[in-house]
Amino acid sequence: MKPFLKKVADVYALNEADRLYKYCFVLPNRRSRVFFESYLSDALNDKHSIFPELTTISDFIDEYSDLVEAGRVEQLFLLYQAYRTLAECDQKQYDDFDHFLHLGDMLLNDFNDIDRYMVDAKELFFNMRNLENIKTDYLSDEQIAVIKEYWGVDKKEVKEDSLFVQSSYVNLWDNMYELYNSFLQALEEKGLTYGGQSYRRVAEKINKMGADDFNFERIIFVGFSTLSNAERMIFERFKKLGIADFYWDFESAFLDKDNKGSYFLNQYIPEFKSIYDIMDSKPTVPNINILSVPSGSGQGLVVRSVLEQLVAENKLDVSDAVNTAIVLPEEKYVNSVLDSVPEMFKSINITMGMSVGQSPIASFLTNLANLEHRKKELKGELSYFYEDVEMLASHPYAVMVGGTGINDLVGEIHRKNAYFVPKSMIAEGGRDLSDLFGINEEEPMVYVERILTRINSALEKDKNNLIERYFVVQYMQALNQIKTVMNRFNVHVEKQSLFFLLSRTMSGAIVPFEGKPLHGLQIMGVLETRSLDFKNIIVLSMNEKVFPTKHYTKSFIPNSIRSAYG
């Protein structure tokens, strides 16, 4: 079967070779762009033609945007600044940044969705303000946690006191439209924006432009699936101007109105039609084998077995394995898969990189954050929950920062059967663990900087720790970015908030692997497979809530309201 992207490349090379330089092809991501470029280059091999513009949807949006996307931390500080200014104007008390942080993070999610889906913000906030019979049933654990954090009440009280929830909820949305506008104004004054707002502004901008305002005679959108309302508006405008063409990756056999998986394509295909017919007259049905594996980590061994079997059956050429993909819905198994690939495969291309969130330093900082979160003042003395101390001690980085004294402390906890570990116990027997626990009441930024510096210095002594050091250096750079933004906004944060900001800054960050996309065995995440076709596909973790992933929306907008606004 001919790959989808190759079909599009071939039909344009055949019919439009002399006009391609006037066209722009827009694809979902960089991965699909690379493959399409290769297919088009092959198709034009014997033709005299100037190559067209090839871009991704995100780069396309950036091209028409007059603002730069701000980092998440800067967005949070700007939102807090707008909130504080509004509170001062209304002569109301306002919370410090630590109190506001989790609420602000959730509001940024809501603002982003509101704009990406072209929702009338004023109307939405009015409806949220007047939502009748608000009950606690729809509240997720995340929402309850934020209410507890922001209004200073217990989760149990939130669940039991629906009147409190209603009044707090209404209070939240009272000035939300004003806050939303103030936030947008603050961003624009600095030449900044955020993802959803960028999509909205570009969609509105393109909607006012004519065909002659673009540098291309035709813009071809290839391989999209689910569209946001902003993307759909862009598609509709280009269609109306008569300068668009659309190609959807689907098999007619799967376009069943009762199949939820084809719900969106059933809408898009009749509305955004293709100039050329690239459908196969006889759709092929894949040969699917399902293998049961008793453990997640054991999947790597099964991958090895499957690869060896494909080679033995002449279904896979080790010298040209680009048509075989290993797809990982769970990034954490990338190392076990790499270790399991047979040595006969000399070339491997890993497109997903290694997640910073799966690194040792990430787990160590999580342990420190948990330690900080559950500490208490007992009998006038700062005390830590014993499980958090034990978890911290079990991490190899704990010794790098605090020495072997941390292991002595765990032994003392067991001997005394302590439930909470007071500050005095930590210092018993001459144990100097103040740097690890940060109990000298120093600035949180100084504390975390020292932690990262000590770990980095310890890792420097062994050349085999290059990847771990890279992760630590990434966190050090992120911390410096946060420090710069904090100084600019003159905001102080506590340790717990600093750990949260670090986590948000590094969210989604990866260590990229160097490779040749068009050579070797392909190892990738699910989203990177969009618009791509392979002869052999090995998908791990085909379990419920993993594939597809169960998404929990961190939002204050109930699902019923979300559905009403599309």
Residue ranges and their predicted role:
Residues 190, 241, 529:
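Residue-level signal for short amphipathic helical patches enriched in basic/charged
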Residues 189-192, 244, 347:
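Residue-level detector of anion-binding/catalytic polar loops
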Residues 159-185, 258-285:
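Short, compositionally biased "basic patch" segments
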Residues 1-61, 65-71, 219, 235-236, ...:
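Anion-coordinating catalytic cores for phosphoryl-, nucleotidyl-, and glycosidic chemistry
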Residues 171, 212, 218-270:
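Extended, H/D-rich, highly charged conserved domains that either
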Residues 1-5, 209-212, 240:
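Short, Lys/Arg-enriched, disordered terminal segments
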Residues 30-213, 229, 408:
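Basic/charged alpha-beta structural segments of nucleotide/phosphate-handling enzymes
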